[in-house]
Amino acid sequence: MSWNHNRRWKDFQALVNAEDYFAFFELPYDPRVVNVNRLHILRKFAQYLAPLEHFQGSEEERLEQARQALEKAYQTFLTSTPQQEKLFRVFQDYGCPDPVGGCAGCSSLGERGECSPGIPA
C-alpha cells in the first residue's frame, strides 16, 4: 500500500462523508465530481464494500480492498452517469428512454411518471 499504514478498520467505520473517505485513503479526487455525484459514488462504494463484510484477510488487506473499492466507485462516475448506473430507484423505475440526452425532448408523462418521447406534430 502506498498510503498510511497506521489506519484501522474501526477508524474507517467511523467515517461519514465522501471527503473523509478520500482523505482517509489519501486518494486524489476532483471536488466538482464528488459534489455532483456524491450519493452515487457512496452507493457504488457500498456495493463494492459488501463482499468485505466476511473478508478473511488481515486488517491491512481489508483496508486496501476498501481503498480500491472507493477508487473504483469514483472512477465509475468519471466515465458514466447516475442515469446509466441506475443505483437509485428514481433511475430504475422512472428512467427516461433517452438517458444520454435527458428528458428535454419529452412532451408528456406516462401513467407511472415515466418520461415519454415527444410525439411529432
From Swiss-Prot:
It comes from Synechococcus sp. (strain JA-3-3Ab) (Cyanobacteria bacterium Yellowstone A-Prime). Keywords: Nitrogen fixation. Transmembrane segments: none annotated. The keyword Nucleotide-binding does not apply. May protect the nitrogenase Fe-Mo protein from oxidative damage. This is Nitrogenase-stabilizing/protective protein NifW. The keyword GTP-binding does not apply. Belongs to the NifW family. Pfam families: NifW. It comes from the Bacteria. Homotrimer; associates with NifD. GO terms for biological process: nitrogen fixation. InterPro entries: NifW (IPR004893).
